[in-house]
Amino acid sequence: MSSQPPRVRSRRSERNQTAERPLEDDIDTSRRGMGPGVRPVVAVTGAASGIGHRVALLLSENEQVKRLIAIDERRGDIPGAQWRIMDVRDPALAGRLDGVDVVLHLDLDLSLDSEPRARGARNVRGTQTVLTAAAAAGVPRVVLCTSAMVYGALPENETPLDEDAPLKATADASLVGDLLEIEELAARAPRAHRALNVTVVRPATLVGGPEADSVLTRHFEAPRLLVVSGSRPRWQFCHVDDLASALVYAALGKVEGVVTVASEGWLEQEEVEELSGMRRMELPASLALGTAERLHRLGLTPAPAGDLAYTMHGWVVPSTRLRDAGWRPLWTNELAFAALLEDVAGRHALVARRLGRKDATTLGAAGATVALIGTAAIVRKVRKRRGI
């Protein structure tokens, strides 16, 4: 790694010590007729683990929260929380939200290892149930969390994107399809339930914990960094700690509508290579995309070819509404990327498929280029076995 931090092509964080918390008097209470200083009752789904647990812990320590309702299928360790042990897809959820002012729905299955159809059905059904239950219980506000990936990664993307830019992602790109359906539900809910306000938080590439495992973090588990010829990647990260603090802002009504969250600025591909010490492997688009598509179609990798676009083109977001509300990220892109490298150390993946130790040793010796091109042999072998 370079001893000097690389130049970032955007403004740095203006403050990197602590994220500001919204003042109680600043909380928007107009939608539920509450006067200034009235503390909300907050419910968090998925509170037993992952980002839901991180957010619930922050809310349990926040004096601006009157009461915390933790919802999950099992109990977690959150001081002072009142637990509701249930599946968020259960229609009985409406009866467990009495007196709640805001619901943070964070109970999503984002695992690359889950069966795609079952995962999608769970995520969409869970979100539908939460929105319907909140409206039925008279909850004024719901906060959802998707991803900035819903904007799509296109060569014509502006840098940074406008928070209100249209969603151009393709629905077949792994988890993005689930997130696009959730976005559609978020857009429809206030029209169907006029008293319901829905906030959607869209983080950049998550790093900083097991809940951040994704196609994009596994990109850095490969023996070399795949670069598609002619592309210009721009890397932007969001540490889970920054996402958690942003979700607290949303819970307290400090931000509404569409909210993006990320470290300030971005890193160019050359900076990522310098910081990581990894060498690039540059391949023509036809070879890289064709190989990824064949491997996915045969069930050998969890990532369809469409996901490679997120490593080819920029999809940088500005965190405008959060910044206007006084929020600042604690993590720069350089620090967040360092956390990512620490998390993936010792892991090995190729086209988002996790490899065993023996496979990784072979790849390290043969080189990633040979491995990728050699997937043609894997394809032929699988086809022969299946009689294709």
Task: Please state what every model-predicted region is.
Residues R39-E61:
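N-terminal Rossmann NAD(P)H-binding glycine-rich loop of SDR-like oxidoreductase domains
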Residues A171-T199:
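Active-site Tyr-X1-5-Lys
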Residues T129-S174:
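Conserved Rossmann-fold NAD(P)-dependent oxidoreductase catalytic core, especially the SDR/UDP-sugar
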Residues I85-Q128, A133, A137, A153:
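NAD(P)H-binding glycine-rich loop region in Rossmannoid oxidoreductase-like domains
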Residues T217-L226, R232-L267:
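Alpha-helical substrate-binding/gating segment
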Residues A246-A305, R347-L355, R380-G387:
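Mid/C-terminal beta-alpha module of Rossmann-like enzyme folds, strongest
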Residues N333-I388:
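Amphipathic terminal alpha-helices
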Residues V240, E270-E271, G299-R328:
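Conserved C-terminal active-site "lid" loop/helix of NAD(P)H-dependent oxidoreductases
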